[in-house]
């Protein structure tokens, strides 16, 4: 092949490459499409100082999806909400009464869904209907058969606390050392996929009396009589759905 023919062939290949159609610009996403999901709203419940949680023998049950009506991020904007995720970050401290004894106990934390709260928050006895002989051992508690259509345990977590007969301010003699025990416990959990749907009455507050259907409770019970206080926060991730 002559040099002129080779040159013409090379020029033809170059022209083909240079005339390729350029990629079209990415199309703008349509409003409300799959690419545009509204961000989850966040409500934070702080428990410290005067608002710390006191956990007595038999436990405590607190409403946590307390979304009052309003325009802020932590408020509900419609008559229906969906709670997707919950994060709990707490520091448990055995109280002075428990620290007088050497003891070890397994406590329990639950997230409990209440289909029809009826205007009043239940007690742990209402939910689990445990006999008085099992009050100090929450690991044995189960939702009663008669109320299983109303109360649904969404999550259940265990934790261990210990006491050694000394309070935190005690100091050992100079020639001794005391082994540590779990009188102070850090408790951190994050859970998703809850799908708790709450229907609200036509009121503005976020109490249990404002809920028509779908309350979510944080239930904590001490094990073997080691009562304590809880300091920290609960964070809920939710959406306002349905009609205004």
UniProtKB/Swiss-Prot annotation:
Residues 1-39 are annotated as: Disordered. Transmembrane segments: none annotated. A motif (Bipartite nuclear localization signal) lies at residues 1-24. Keywords: Capsid protein, DNA-binding, Host nucleus, T=1 icosahedral capsid protein, Viral penetration into host nucleus, Virion, Virus entry into host cell. It is found in: Virion; Host nucleus. Belongs to the geminiviridae capsid protein family. This is Capsid protein. It comes from Maize streak virus genotype D (isolate Raw) (MSV). The lineage of its organism: Viruses, Monodnaviria, Shotokuvirae, Cressdnaviricota, Repensiviricetes.
């Amino acid at each position: 092949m002559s040099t002129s023919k080779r040159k013409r062939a090379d020029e033809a290949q170059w022209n083909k490459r240079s005339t390729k159609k350029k990629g079209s610009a990415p199309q703008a996403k349509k409003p409300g499409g799959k690419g545009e999901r509204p961000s989850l709203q966040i409500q934070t419940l702080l428990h410290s100082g005067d608002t710390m949680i006191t956990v007595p023998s038999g436990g405590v049950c607190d409403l946590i999806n307390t979304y009052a009506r309003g325009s802020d991020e932590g408020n509900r904007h419609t008559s229906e909400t969906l709670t997707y995720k919950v994060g709990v970050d707490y520091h448990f401290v055995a109280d002075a009464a428990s620290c007088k004894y050497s003891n070890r106990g397994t406590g329990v934390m639950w997230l409990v869904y209440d289909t029809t709260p009826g205007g009043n928050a239940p007690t742990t006895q209402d939910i689990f209907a445990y006999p008085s002989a099992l009050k100090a051992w929450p690991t044995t508690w189960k939702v009663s058969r008669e109320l299983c259509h109303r109360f649904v345990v969404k999550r259940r977590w265990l934790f261990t606390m210990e006491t050694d007969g000394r309070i935190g301010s005690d100091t050992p003699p100079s020639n001794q050392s005391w082994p540590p025990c779990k009188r102070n416990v850090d408790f951190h959990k994050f859970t998703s996929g809850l799908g708790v749907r709450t229907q609200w009455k036509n009121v503005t507050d976020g109490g249990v009396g404002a809920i028509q259907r779908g309350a979510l409770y944080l239930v904590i019970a001490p094990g073997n009589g080691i009562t304590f206080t809880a300091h920290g926060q609960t964070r809920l991730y939710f959406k306002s759905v349905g009609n205004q």
